[in-house]
Each structure stands twice: as structure tokens, then as C-alpha cells.
Amino acid sequence: MGLKAAQKTLFPLRSIDDVVRLFAAELGREEPDLVLLSLVLGFVEHFLAVNRVIPTNVPELTFQPSPAPDPPGGLTYFPVADLSIIAALYARFTAQIRGAVDLSLYPREGGVSSRELVKKVSDVIWNSLSRSYFKDRAHIQSLFSFITGTKLDSSGVAFAVVGACQALGLRDVHLALSEDHAWVVFGPNGEQTAEVTWHGKGNEDRRGQTVNAGVAERSWLYLKGSYMRCDRKMEVAFMVCAINPSIDLHTDSLELLQLQQKLLWLLYDLGHLERYPMALGNLADLEELEPTPGRPDPLTLYHKGIASAKTYYRDEHIYPYMYLAGYHCRNRNVREALQAWADTATVIQDYNYCREDEEIYKEFFEVANDVIPNLLKEAASLLEAGEERPGEQTQGVQSQGSALQDPECFAHLLRFYDGICKWEEGSPTPVLHVGWATFLVQSLGRFEGQVRQKVRIVSREAEAAEAEELWGEEAREGRRRGPRRESKPEEPPPPKKPALDKGPGGGQGAMSGPPRKPPGTVPGTARGPEGGSTAPAPAPAASPPPEGPVLTFQSEKMKGMKELLVATKINSSAIKLQLTAQSQVQMKKQKVSTPSDYTLSFLKRQRKGL
């Protein structure tokens, strides 16, 4: 059983538009042919990014010239996907799979696949791969690479298993995706899960097992169960997102970028990206490089990705916020970038850092110890230059420099680190070390003391204790004195922003869009019904609270450092000590506690006692 007659009529594919036309036709079917589409994309990518030299020893292979926009009068060449080439590759793949899997040995009760059958298909793909190759190399994600080079990367293996299952008529087997891993779901309503590929250094022994253990340990790799369960159209979107346009470290294929952008817009228009936050971020990045007339701007697409994560995945995806922060960083929007990174840390704080989460650790490490310090360093230089030569800078440059005079930016920086510290609490692997502390001190030092002191850090525990004490005093002394000052309900609190709910329907700082929030307020770090309270603590009548953002820390480390963080002069030694000390001894707690109970009492000892 090969290609259908309707599919054959679309060949040969001589241009980007021809490939888009093929995808549109397949997406119009109930079951788009994953094998066909992956072979076509792999073929085009190979001759546009891997082997750009026009071969003379393959008579069936030709290249279609077309005018190039740059330089004027130049030509660009597109590899012609002839029917004979694609049909031969298609027949080879389907014959290999059907010849190796005897479906009669695996009864399908109720028309659903068994774990043994899924494991068998994954064995066929796995055992067909080369024994030794660099598994992180580029351009080995498609079935074209599998057939012609017997090489696949990690997610490519998972996709190949799904494509093979479709070729066998197993319609219940679908791709499952987290932000750094892939496996399959199958059975009634996709309730069963099975590992089919490796992750990181390789976990061959996990193939066939469920992902329940990873979900239970609250690792980012499995997103606490909030992973994507793809249908066939989303699996097409996955292969489009997997297109790698890089020719080398410094050059991308313009044709592949255009092809990916057009295919993503096709999927967007058909509604197949609604549940795919990372695809929306990918499309936004492409639009930033080359805007499409009449289409939504990149910022709108980034926010759509965040909205998708909130609506369908309990706001437990990291990369939608990373995409947004990267956009603002590239455009030197310091305040917005810091806010998006803080929102990213607010999401990660509810995970446990596990051994296989090294990819997201590297992301946060780079942001905290490279990107943010350099962004603030540049802002400091612009601020200094503006003070020396006032009136010579553009409004955007002035805005970038003035970020260091904005207490709201400082509050976002603290919220970012608060999320990282909370992420570490209860985790089996420490996160923070002295390298983090060094750059934290450096970033704190970019803000003047009077700016830092405008941020008001409150503690719900302190508020509760003070309220309890006040009620006790009222009971004892109510008959002996007049009403307390705190009992005046008509006395309005200082302006503040209400707490942001991170649930599926809740708002988020990064989702507020163009309207600016009231000055002097930032969202708290907590998520869900009980988190993020930004209400100020009752202040003594003699010292009214300072104007500025109000922030509630969630992590015990940041709570222990709150006086140091807003002090007039930064005590770098004390900050470094307190940020790293618990990381060194967190597995030797003095009492049995839940993951959220994270005592820092030993940090109050004298230095010689440590």
C-alpha cells in the first residue's frame, strides 16, 4: 500500500508554495499522512541545509531556480521533490515496518493498542538505528534521515514510532510532548503512556515504561502531567517546528525559514496551534525576523502562547514566558524582560529540580548569570552616559537606562530569584551555588540604595503573627483604652496591584498587554488561590509605609535575606553566604518536614558557627 492517487497528483514539488499546497491537502484529511510529510520535509531540509552542493550523480534529482530577493538579479535553487524519489522512500519505510511487526501476535481488544505492541514498534525503530553516531547533531529528526542515514535524534525516534504506528493502522497511538522530551500515549482516550526514546545521556531501559514516576516526582521534564497530548494535526505541527534551518553556526537557509513560516501560518489559520504554545513562540520568532504583512505582530503571538499554556496546561509551561522575555531582551525592554523572567521563575517554583532537568537549569543559569547582568550593565552605561550628556539620547535609550531607577524593575529581579530559590526547596538536587551568588550581588548593585528601599517586602507569617498579637491585646486591654489606629476601615491602603492568579483563567503580569499597571506595584510570587498576596502589612502609625512595589516572598532563602536586599549598602558576603548555605546542607535537615517546610534558622548563627 503506497501513496494515494490524490497525493501523487501534487508532485513534483518545485517550490515552497508546492510544499505548502501538499500540507494543506493533507491537513484537510482526517488522518494526514505523517510519513509522507516527514519524508518531504526531510528531503527539502537535506538539500537546503546539509548538502547544498548540487549533485551530478543523481539523475532523478533536479533543482528549480527562482529569482532571489537578495542580491537583486540573483537566483535561488529549490530541490525538486520528484514523485519517484518520495514514493521509493515511502515504500521502503512502510515495507520495513510492516515486515517487522506481525499484528496477529498482538490482539487489539476494543480496537486499541497494547503496551506490548507499542514496545514492539519502538524496538523496530530503535534496532534500525546506527549503533554509533552523535545523537545531538542537527538535521536528523525526520524520517528522511531515518531511511537514508539510519540516524534519528531523541524526539525523532518518538515521532518515527508514531509514524510507524499510523502506517500499521494504529490510530490510537499519538505523540506526547513536554518541553524537552517526547513519548507516546495510547489506549482508550490516550490514557496509557509509554517511553519510546531516550533522554539526555540515554535511558534505553525505560522504553515501554509509563511516565508516571516522572510526573509524580514533579520534575520539569514531565511537566507534572501538563504535557501536550497531540492529535494528528498537532503532530504535523511538531514536524514543522522541528525544521532546522541552520546551515552552520552562523548561517541559516532563507528558504527553510520561509517554508517553516508559511507552514506555521497554515497551521495557525486552521486552528492547529491553539494548544501548542511553543509553536506559537516559534512563529513569533520568525515574524520578528521577517514580518508577514497583515499578520499579528510577534508580541501578540507571544501572548497567545502564554494564554494557550494557561488555558490548556494549567500555566505550567516555562518556554512561553522564555520566548517573551527573549523578545523584550533583544529589543532592550529591560522592565518587560525582567517581568517575563520573573513570571518564568514563578512557574518553575512549583517544580522539583531533578537530575534530568539540566536543560531548563542551563536556561535559568544563563539568564541569571549572563543575560541579566549584561542587560543591566548596558542599562547602567546608558544611564551614566545620559547623565553626562542629557538631551542627546533617544527616548528608547533613555527608557532602558531609567530601568535602574525603577523600583518595579528591582522587584521583578527579586521575584525572579525568589522563584529559583523556591524551585530548590524540597528538590533532590541543589540548584544554587557561589556562581549564582556572585552575579546576584552584581545585579543588585546596579540599583541604588534609595531605589531598592522603595520595594516593600512583606511576610504573610509576620502579618498573621501581628494580627494574632493585636487580637490578644484587644481582649486584654479593650476596656482600658480607646480604639486602636488599625481599626479604622476607612483608611485606604497605599495603591497596589491585586494578586495575579496563575490558574487557567487568571491574569499574569506578562499577559497584561499594552496597558500599563499602576505604578509602584508588582505581582507576588505565589500562584493559585492562596498565593501572590500583595497587600501591605499593617504598619505602625508613626512610620507610614514607603511608596513603591509591594512584594511577598515565597522562598525561605529570600525571606531570610529581605533586610539585606533592601539595605542602603549591599553586604555581598552575607548575601552570598545565605544564598548558598542551604544548598550545601539542605539534605541534612534537622527535622522531618514536608518539601515546603524549609527552615533557615541555622543561617542566623554567627559566621564562626558555620
Curated annotation (Swiss-Prot):
Residues 537-548 have a biased composition (Pro residues). CDD domains: Menin. Its main location: nucleus. Residues 462-552 are annotated as: Disordered. GO terms for molecular function: chromatin binding; transcription cis-regulatory region binding; Y-form DNA binding. It holds the Pfam family Menin. Keywords: Chromatin regulator, DNA-binding, Nucleus, Phosphoprotein, Repressor, Transcription, Transcription regulation. Residues 214-390 are annotated as: Interaction with FANCD2. GO terms for biological process: chromatin organization; negative regulation of cell cycle; negative regulation of cell population proliferation; regulation of transcription by RNA polymerase II. GO terms for cellular component: chromatin; histone methyltransferase complex. The keyword Iron does not apply. It is found in: Nucleus. The modification Phosphothreonine is found at T594. The modification Phosphoserine is found at S487, S543. Residues 484-500 have a biased composition (Basic and acidic residues). Component of the MLL-HCF complex, at least composed of KMT2A/MLL1, MEN1, ASH2L, RBBP5, DPY30, WDR5, HCFC1 and HCFC2. Component of the menin-associated histone methyltransferase complex, at least composed of KMT2B/MLL4, MEN1, ASH2L, RBBP5, DPY30 and WDR5. Interacts with POLR2B. Interacts with POLR2A phosphorylated at 'Ser-5', but not with the unphosphorylated, nor 'Ser-2' phosphorylated POLR2A forms. Interacts with FANCD2 and DBF4. Interacts with SMAD3, but not with SMAD2, nor SMAD4. Directly interacts with NFKB1, NFKB2 and RELA. Essential component of a MLL/SET1 histone methyltransferase (HMT) complex, a complex that specifically methylates 'Lys-4' of histone H3 (H3K4). Functions as a transcriptional regulator. Binds to the TERT promoter and represses telomerase expression. Plays a role in TGFB1-mediated inhibition of cell-proliferation, possibly regulating SMAD3 transcriptional activity. Represses JUND-mediated transcriptional activation on AP1 sites, as well as that mediated by NFKB subunit RELA. Positively regulates HOXC8 and HOXC6 gene expression. This is Menin. It comes from Canis lupus familiaris (Dog). The lineage of its organism: Eukaryota, Metazoa, Chordata, Craniata, Vertebrata. The gene is MEN1.
